Amino acid sequence: SCVSLLGAKPVFADVDYNSQNITAQNIEKLITKRTKAIICVHLGGMPCEMDPIIRLAKRYNLFVIEDCAQAHGAMYKGKSVGSIGHVSTWSFCNDKIMTLGGEGGMITTNSKRIDSFARAFNNHGKNFKKLSPQLKSKIPKFKYIHDDIGTNYRMTEMQASIGRIQLKKLQKWSQARAKNANEIYKAIEHLPIARIPIIEDHLKHAFYKCYVMIDKKYLQVGWSRDKIIYEINARGVSCFSGSCPEIYLEKSFKKSYKISLKNAKALGRDSLMLTVHPTLTNKEIAKIKTAVKEVLLLASK
């Protein structure tokens, strides 16, 4: 939506079936003279394969924007996601790994130009270089300081305080999320019907959620991914289908796009999403493992 609101046209690349992320190979097929930037979404906390994407962006002189909304604490080759591209966006919505009491977000960048623009944009378009001398003057005079159109998307001090406290807890939370996800994976890894995402050694997964893909060739007659979700929920365990797989099918985009992306479509059909947040107790994780394993066994040939 943010791309469309600027009057630009988002172009959708297919994703890798294992990571659910876009790849340099799929991006390059879509680059034209009108392409301005690449948006990499580290979906579910799984980092994108960034080195090939950065090389591609340099070759075509494109900006790289990292969407880290679900990836607080994720790492790529020892670097935090969000520190690799030109600019990154973070979400502190109430469901995210970090939250600021309901809503909020953050932009990070190592570009002074982008930083200056972002600070002005979220504060009515003020040029702070012009504002600073005015505040220091013994006899302040009125000065025109709004160089551009802006907003009032300012974070409150209370929200920032909550975020700073949560930052100190992030490492411990990340460890708990990984532990919870790995316990679920161990409970079902021997089942042919369950395909567990491969996490390469150079990646640190943030585990915003725990994804499992259903291998449809092992499904019993009369079973589907949706029936599996229903049965897991019926056992008192939260289970979802995951992020929107084919966003171009949303009504807001459907008229403009006549495409079907193979892997995105397959993931929309096959994915299960389970909760692994750090406040879950050992008893609750045990309940999740039991319910998921029980239902997958029932659904298996």
What are these language model-derived features?
Residues 90-91, 105-111:
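Short beta-strand-to-turn element immediately C-terminal to the catalytic PLP-Schiff-base lysine
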